[in-house]
Amino acid sequence: MKQAFNQRISSALNQRKQAGLNRSRRVVSQGNQATLVVDGKSYLNFSGNDYLGLASSKELMEAWQEGLSLYGSGSGASPLVTGYSKPHANLESQLAEWLGLDCAILFNSGFSANQAVLFSLLEKGDTLLQDKLNHASLMEAGMLSPAVMKRFKHNDVDHLKSLLKRSSDEPTLVVTEGVFSMDGDLSPLADIAKLTKENDAWLMVDDAHGCGVLGTNGKGCCDVYSITPDILIVTFGKGFGLSGAAVLCNQECGDYLSQFARHHVYSTAMPPAQAHALSHALLMIQQQEWRRDKLKELNQQFESELMNFLGAEKTPTPIKPIIIGEATDAMILADSLKERGLWTTAIRPPTVPVGSARIRVTLSANHSSADISALTQAINELG
């Protein structure tokens, strides 16, 4: 019987290798900066999610060091035992006030926050409607939940409308991302919010890639479209330059999650020093508009310099997909760019649909205009 696991593991690995879809981890130095180092060689880094450049900010590092001196290294327990401290409470109240919802509940990752909501909220007889391109954390939780999950075509409001009409008699939760991580496009949140309200459904928005980057003072996609969802997910590994996540909702829903969301109840709380640093990151996001202004300038430059490159998608975000098609071709381009000192990542199935393998370029406020030109010139020449 023990051999069955070995055979299963070996077979899965071999299939992925034969399909050219095997992925590997690379040990990097300074991976949170505009330049990273791998095996002693420097590369311009166009693969991270540190959009505002906070991850390497000395100001933010000093805030975390201050938190360490005040609160020590770890929280020591789960939130409902003794792991919930003043920095956690402060961060939650600051997030709720900033984003205009009653309360916030902290989680250790966006993946766990998404799964916690779906696993704790949905019951048998409920309907879950998800955008087809939602994150793996949402899709996995939906498939494993007792609810009936249906997927609507990407950003297709008419398809969602038809699904809502069919599920009008059941409690229904509609889930979409604010910014889609592989395409860099925005969800039509105003239309979706209107539909959910008309059909007495709840709306959940995962704004992992929008919060901090878009909207007034970085409030994210919901601010862009002037909506307030029933549940809002924000994560701290992108615009905030750190890690972790929060679920924002009304007070009663927050009380419910603090009792029944197992990812929250049974996980050690994030270090209080981290929560302290996140409060400072929030202040930087609110006050340092120059970071978003610079991103806009770099975005315009990137799209202008690749305007004639087939497959370069225009987006209103720092996520710039370059659609190649076949996975092997995407890998070849990524490797060729690395030879020129440009670190990009080839995104292949199953992360994206078959036939849509791509180079996923991400921009950061830490990049310079010269960095962008180096990348676009290489892409134009190699493509």
From Swiss-Prot:
Spans traversing the lipid bilayer: none
Amino acids binding substrate: 23, 135, 351
NCBIfam families, per database record: bioF
PROSITE patterns: AA_TRANSFER_CLASS_2
Catalytically driven reaction(s): 6-carboxyhexanoyl-[ACP] + L-alanine + H(+) = (8S)-8-amino-7-oxononanoate + holo-[ACP] + CO2
E.C. numbers: 2.3.1.47
Cofactor list: pyridoxal 5'-phosphate
One GO MF term: 8-amino-7-oxononanoate synthase activity
Keywords from the UniProt entry: Biotin biosynthesis, Pyridoxal phosphate, Transferase
Organism: Aliivibrio fischeri (strain ATCC 700601 / ES114) (Vibrio fischeri)
GO biological process: biotin biosynthetic process
Subunit relationships: Homodimer.
PTM sites of type N6-(pyridoxal phosphate)lysine: 238
Function recorded in the entry: Catalyzes the decarboxylative condensation of pimeloyl-[acyl-carrier protein] and L-alanine to produce 8-amino-7-oxononanoate (AON), [acyl-carrier protein], and carbon dioxide.
Protein name: 8-amino-7-oxononanoate synthase
Residues binding pyridoxal 5'-phosphate: 110-111, 181, 209, 235
InterPro entries: Aminotrans_II_pyridoxalP_BS (IPR001917), Aminotransferase_I/II_large (IPR004839), AON_synthase_class-II (IPR050087), AONS_Archaea/Proteobacteria (IPR004723), AONS_Proteobacteria (IPR022834), PyrdxlP-dep_Trfase (IPR015424), PyrdxlP-dep_Trfase_major (IPR015421), PyrdxlP-dep_Trfase_small (IPR015422)
Pathway assigned to this chain's UniProt record: Cofactor biosynthesis; biotin biosynthesis
Similarity annotation: Belongs to the class-II pyridoxal-phosphate-dependent aminotransferase family. BioF subfamily.
